[in-house]
Each structure stands twice: as structure tokens, then as C-alpha cells.
């Protein structure tokens, strides 16, 4: 029985999943935290059950050794499940990578060269790739880029209206993120509706602590809310989303904030956290339900921004067949879905209150019978999408 190992390597973490290449079943999952921070923590779940323990993990190479040891003790030994590929999540592929790519030394060098576009992610992704290639030297390794799905954007969609030569020199343009999720979900919607992907006009809302919207026309991304970085777009847990750039000049002059302080403000101290002191949507909703006006305003701001993108993308698509909510908040917050869809009957979006309120772990339709636009909740599965793309890359050679 062959399998694909999917790896998501963060700066101090290693998340992994072993997926059966034929059944697409998750055979084992795990998370290793606090890599390089002294005593690390391992959580592993496989056929033999679940385990959680601590271990000194100085670097990603040690994290892979710990992962192999966990596989060896839970009944999902990689000897019994030989690997067809190792699929790696890489956040930023710039404009160089538009498809899953078999890792070579040149590919590693290119990922490293793009680190200035994703300084918090690409170096950690590359550490994981190098450690994995050392652990599995005979297995093909495939990089799957979050930005790749958005390489189909037209120049009018990805161009910022600034000095063209300066933008070209410093690689300033819209790249978009969450592409692996948007690709998976848009495909799952077509399957659920029993319609060809190529004929569907879709909007996918990936709503977690990070959040993005994507307009998908016939399976192709034509616009997305995140930009050169994941900061642009929707209101998020700790990120501001769209903001007038002149606000930064104003805060620099009047509050004396430097570049690094402004970066910290917009990426880590804004969004829900900045508005309410809570970065988790569940906490914000709990406080709002107790009568807190500031928390209520934050929820209204989130919904307002969602409506803004739903309307804009419906216009860009020239109509809409399906609106889909996914990721942690999108899948589990019926009140936000209701607020985002309220008043959008003019666009053909009609939510069914009972269907929307019903709790279910699976993919489901939550729009009313007769709604011109089908509204869905579809759980994302980025690991499975990475596994699929890794196998496709290996098969293509």
C-alpha cells in the first residue's frame, strides 16, 4: 500500500499527514511544536491510537527523526506504507512557480530567493524540505505553492498602480494566498453539485484566523483578496485587511511609529484583536452576545467587508453559480454566514435559516430551495489537495 507524506513546515513547527495514495484516507496525522525552542511537544495519531509527549527537538532534522519514530510505534510504519512522494506546502512561489514542482537544488535556490516576499514562511518551508530530503533521499519531493492557483490572474487583476519600473524591480504585484484551499474547495463544489467545474462561476470564502476571498471562473482564479502579502483584503484575526496606505504615513508622523512597528501593528495587532482585544472569532461573538457594542461593531465590520468582496466578484464573474464558506470560521459560524448573505437577494443569494443553523461536519448546501445562487459550506482539505498535486507532478515526471 503506497502513500504520500504531506508536510507543512513552520518556523517552529512541523505538521504532517500520511495519506493513502489510492483511497485518499488519512492514515496518520501529527504536529510537532516548539522546534528549536528547547523542549518540543509531539502529538501523533495513527492506527495504533494517539500519543502526546515532549522531547528535545533542536531543528527540523531532529523533528523529522521524531516523526519517523512516532510512525514506527503506532502501526503506520513507513516501511508498510512506502512513499510515492513527499508533498511540501510552500507559501510563496512568486511568479516563477505556477504548478506543483519536483524539488531540485535549483528549485530550493529559487524558494530561498523568494524569501523576501514571505520572510516568515519560505525559510521555514525550505528548512522542512531540506530535512525531508535528508530523511527520504530516494523519494520524489514536490513543492506545492499557495500562490500557484492564482497565476491565472490577468495583469489588470494583479497589477498595482504604482511606478511600473519600481514594481518590476522589487516584484511588487498581487500574488494571492490560500490557493491550495481555494483549488480544493472549488473542485469539491463542482463534484457536490454534479456539474462540470469548467462551467461554474464561484466565490470561495476561506475564513479562518487568516481569511481570503477568491473569484473562480471555470476552475481558474480570476481575482483574490490577498495581495503581495497575506495582509490585504478581508478583516482577519490579527490582520487589518484593506486599509488606506496613507494611514501608515499619518501614524508614522503623528504617533512616531517606525516601519517595523507599523508592520507589527497591521499584521499582529489589528483585525479582530485590534478592534476588541480578542483575536478569536468565537471570543468576539461571545462578548458581542453579552451586549458589548465594540464587539458588535467588529462583527459588523467583518460582514461588511465580506459583502464588499461578494458583490465585486459577482460583477467580475458576470454572474454567480455558487458561494462557498470554508475553513474554521467559515465552516463553523452560521451567524457570520447569515450576516454576510443578508440583503444579497439582489444578487440571487438566498440563505435557508434552518439549513444554515444546522451543525454538520460534512459538505452541505445551506441556500434556500429556488435560490439562484447555491450557497454551500465545504470543509477544506489542503493536505489532500497537496497529496493529489504531488502525485500528479510525479506522474508527469
Curated annotation (Swiss-Prot):
Tell me yes or no: is Protein transport among this UniProt entry's keywords: no
Q: Which GO terms describe its cellular component?
A: cytoplasm
| Site (Transition state stabilizer): residue numbering on this chain | 178, 239
Keyword annotations from UniProtKB, A to Z: ATP-binding, Cytoplasm, Kinase, Magnesium, Metal-binding, Nucleotide-binding, Transferase
- Pfam families on file: Acetate_kinase (PF00871)
Active-site residues per Swiss-Prot or TrEMBL entry:
146
- Binding residue positions for substrate: 89
Subcellular location per UniProt equals: Cytoplasm
* Main enzyme class: transferase
Keyword Nucleotide-binding in the entry? The reply is yes
What is the required cofactor set for this protein?
Mg(2+); Mn(2+)
- One Gene Ontology term of the molecular function aspect: acetate kinase activity
Q: What EC number(s) are associated with this protein in UniProt?
A: 2.7.2.1
Q: Which residues bind Mg(2+)?
A: 8, 382
* Coarse class of the protein's main subcellular location: cytoplasm
User: What's this protein's function?
Assistant: Catalyzes the formation of acetyl phosphate from acetate and ATP. Can also catalyze the reverse reaction.
Assembly behavior: Homodimer.
| PANTHER family with a match to the protein in the record | ACETATE KINASE, ACETATE KINASE-RELATED
Family under the similarity heading: Belongs to the acetokinase family.
Full protein name: Acetate kinase
Q: Which organism is it from?
A: Leifsonia xyli subsp. xyli (strain CTCB07)
Q: Quick one: which gene encodes this?
A: ackA
Amino acid at each position: 500500500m503506497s502513500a504520500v507524506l504531506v508536510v507543512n513546515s513552520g518556523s517552529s513547527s512541523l505538521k504532517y499527514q500520511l495519506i493513502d495514495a489510492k483511497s485518499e484516507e488519512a492514515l496518520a496525522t501529527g504536529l510537532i511544536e516548539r522546534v528549536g525552542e528547547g523542549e518540543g511537544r509531539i502529538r501523533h495519531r495513527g492506527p495504533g491510537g494517539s500519543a502526546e509527549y515532549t522531547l528535545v527537538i533542536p531543528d527540523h532534522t531532529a523533528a523529522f527523526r521524531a516523526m519517523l519514530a512516532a510512525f514506527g510505534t503506532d502501526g503506520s510504519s513507513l516501511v508498510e506504507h512506502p512513499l510515492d512522494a513527499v508533498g511540501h506546502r510552500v507559501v510563496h512561489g512568486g511568479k516563477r512557480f505556477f504548478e506543483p514542482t519536483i524539488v531540485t537544488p535549483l528549485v530550493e535556490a529559487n524558494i530561498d530567493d523568494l524569501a523576501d516576499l514571505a520572510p516568515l514562511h519560505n525559510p521555514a518551508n525550505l528548512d522542512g524540505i531540506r530535512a525531508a530530503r535528508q530523511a527520504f533521499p530516494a523519494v520524489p519531493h514536490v513543492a506545492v505553492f499557495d500562490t500557484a492557483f492564482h497565476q491565472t490572474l490577468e495583469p489588470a487583476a494583479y497589477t498595482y498602480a504604482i511606478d511600473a519600473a519600481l514594481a518590476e524591480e522589487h516584484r511588487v504585484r498581487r500574488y494571492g494566498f490560500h490557493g491550495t484551499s481555494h483549488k480544493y474547495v472549488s473542485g469539491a463544489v463542482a463534484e457536490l453539485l454534479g456539474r462540470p467545474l469548467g462551467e461554474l462561476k464561484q466565490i470561495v470564502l476561506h475564513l479562518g484566523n487568516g481569511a481570503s476571498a477568491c473569484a473562480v471562473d471555470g476552475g481558474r482564479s480570476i481575482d483574490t483578496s490577498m495581495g503581495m502579502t497575506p495582509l490585504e483584503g478581508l478583516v482577519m484575526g490579527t490582520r487589518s485587511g484593506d486599509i488606506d496606505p496613507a494611514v501608515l504615513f499619518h501614524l508614522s508622523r503623528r504617533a512616531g511609529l517606525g516601519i517595523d512597528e507599523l508592520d507589527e501593528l497591521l499584521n499582529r495587532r489589528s483585525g479582530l484583536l485590534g478592534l476588541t482585544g480578542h483575536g478569536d472569532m468565537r471570543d468576539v461573538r461571545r462578548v458581542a452576545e453579552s451586549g458589548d457594542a465594540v464587539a458588535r461593531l467588529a462583527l459588523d465590520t467583518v460582514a461588511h467587508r465580506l459583502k464588499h468582496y461578494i458583490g465585486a466578484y459577482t460583477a467580475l464573474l458576470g454572474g454567480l453559480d455558487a458561494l462557498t464558506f470554508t475553513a474554521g470560521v467559515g465552516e463553523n459560524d452560521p451567524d457570520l454566514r447569515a450576516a454576510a448573505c443578508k440583503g444579497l437577494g439582489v444578487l440571487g443569494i438566498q440563505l435557508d435559516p434552518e439549513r444554515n443553523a444546522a451543525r454538520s461536519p460534512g459538505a452541505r448546501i445551506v441556500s434556500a430551495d429556488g435560490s439562484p445562487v447555491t450557497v454551500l459550506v465545504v470543509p477544506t482539505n489542503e493536505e489532500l489537495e497537496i497529496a493529489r498535486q504531488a502525485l500528479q507532478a510525479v506522474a508527469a515526471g
